[in-house]
Amino acid sequence: MRKIIIAGNWKMHKTQAEAQAFLQGFKPLIEDAAESREVVLCVPFTDLSGMSQQLHGGRVRLGAQNVHWEASGAYTGEISAAMLTEIGIHYVVIGHSERRQYFGETDETANLRVLAAQKAGLIPILCVGESKAQRDAGETEQVIVDQVKKGLVNVDQSNLVIAYEPIWAIGTGDTCAATEANRVIGLIREQLTNSQVTIQYGGSVNANNVDEIMAQPEIDGALVGGASLEPQSFARIVNFQP
């Protein structure tokens, strides 16, 4: 059975004090969540160490939002996978469209990051997704297949999460129809050699649409942006009712 993973991506939000306040409000709200659901918070680097200490032994896992592919070296501003595992981090988001758009990341560099993450014992969450222009041009399938194949070269698919995040739905409120997200995620699954890989949907997931999204047979979780910043809304997503 594929693991259900609900992950929040805080992006560049929350100071350490704000993160601690979030956890105080959030943890009691998910005490009764199904044990089969993995809950992950992917937070800024500055929040990781303090949150790791507060969450130690609990059910919420921590993830980073990026990682470099080299183990060490003259890479100013970068973080290695070993630095993350040392403080108890389990997951790392790789290849998010914002990293691709603003920082020039590619399928090839995403692949290097995935390999480095796995080598260090982290679970990579590889993001793929098409732009509005690509969808309008009928290129969704080709774009997604290319991203998946290039991102997974030599990757161990037993230690992997994929997130389908159509770029046009991220932070716009314009959610991809649940059935269409299910179709594309089914296409992604066809490219894999391991049928048990967890594939999430991301893109304006919120408390109002999560039940319909999670009712789809191919969707194994959600990568949640803005709705993960508030304890009540993210707890409602974790406690979805498909």
From Swiss-Prot:
Q: Where does substrate bind?
A: 9-11, 171, 204, 225-226
Q: Report the Pfam families cross-referenced here.
A: TIM
Sorted alphabetically, which InterPro entries does this protein's record hold?
A: Aldolase_TIM, TIM_sf, TrioseP_Isoase_bac/euk, Triosephosphate_isomerase, Triosephosphate_isomerase_AS
Report the main location listed first in the record: cytoplasm
Write out the catalysed reaction.
D-glyceraldehyde 3-phosphate = dihydroxyacetone phosphate
Query: Which segments does the entry list as coiled coil?
Result: none
Q: Where in the cell is it found?
A: Cytoplasm
Task: State the active site.
Answer: 96, 165
Q: Assembly and partners?
A: Homodimer.
Q: What name is this protein filed under?
A: Triosephosphate isomerase
- From what organism does this protein derive? Synechocystis sp. (strain ATCC 27184 / PCC 6803 / Kazusa)
Gene name tied to this protein? tpiA
